[in-house]
């Protein structure tokens, strides 16, 4: 029996395919990963280093554990070129959350969100050395507990752009961003926050 080509095409699609996010800098190319982060969703290969992570019907609830002496952190073992990441978050008492991007050895960049502000930065890339973090944007913005918000991070070439809820955007540029990126991660300081609808796309610059 022959299988129709249309069926084969559908079977080749990733599970839980997400809609390509709206962007300012890049065009979404190929979907690399989609994880609803709920108890019903097919889980991506997250590596939890710190904290408590529990999948619920609403999303993955994340808490910092006092015994860890470190914020909750979970990462994907994923090498990245130019990319787009989109996800939703809800603060449920957390002091802060972040989306963090590394290279093979060190932190590279992050989007940090508190109940009162969000920050976009290139991270300190050598810890005890001369390098220092560079803050591209530190904007006052209220994120009320219990309300959902949407984040899109684009990194293409030497530029990163972050947009929250389709209206608040900031960008920065650094030569470091041209190097291979890896291990995108979510973090949470305090108790607690919930994440859902995480998607990762390869990207190409707008023509």
Regions found by a protein language model. Name each.
Residues 163-183:
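Short, solvent-exposed beta-strand-to-loop segments that form ligand-recognition rims
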Residues 52-70:
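Short carbohydrate-recognition loop motifs
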Residues 65-126:
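Secretory/extracellular carbohydrate-interaction modules
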Residues 128-150:
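Short, aromatic/His-centered strand-loop micro-motif at the edge of beta-sheets
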Residues 71-78, 137-143, 184-185:
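Beta-strand-rich interaction surfaces with strong enrichment in secreted/lumenal proteins
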Residues 179-207:
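Ligand-recognition surfaces built from glycine- and aromatic
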Residues 19-48, 207:
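Extracellular carbohydrate-recognition regions
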Residues 37, 85-87, 148-162:
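Short tryptophan-centered beta-strand motifs in secreted/extracellular beta-sheet-rich domains
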């Amino acid at each position: 029996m022959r299988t129709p080509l249309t069926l084969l095409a559908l079977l080749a699609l990733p599970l839980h395919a997400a809609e390509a996010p709206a962007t300012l800098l890049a065009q979404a190319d190929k979907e690399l990963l989609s994880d609803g982060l709920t108890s019903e969703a097919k889980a991506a290969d997250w590596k939890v280093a710190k904290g408590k992570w529990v999948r619920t019907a609403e999303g993955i609830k994340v808490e910092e554990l006092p015994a860890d002496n470190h914020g909750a952190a979970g990462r994907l073992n994923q090498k990245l070129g130019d990319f787009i990441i989109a996800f939703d978050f809800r603060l449920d008492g957390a002091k802060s959350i972040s989306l963090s991007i590394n290279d093979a050895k060190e932190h590279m960049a992050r989007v940090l969100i508190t109940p009162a502000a969000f920050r976009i930065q290139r991270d300190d890339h050598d810890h005890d050395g001369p390098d220092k973090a560079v803050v591209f944007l530190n904007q006052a913005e209220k994120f009320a507990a219990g309300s959902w918000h949407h984040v899109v991070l684009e990194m293409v070439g030497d530029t990163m752009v972050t947009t929250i809820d389709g209206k608040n955007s900031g960008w920065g540029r650094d030569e470091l961003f041209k190097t291979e990126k890896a291990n995108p991660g979510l973090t949470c300081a305090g108790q607690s926050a919930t994440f859902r609808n995480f998607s990762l796309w390869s990207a190409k610059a707008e023509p």
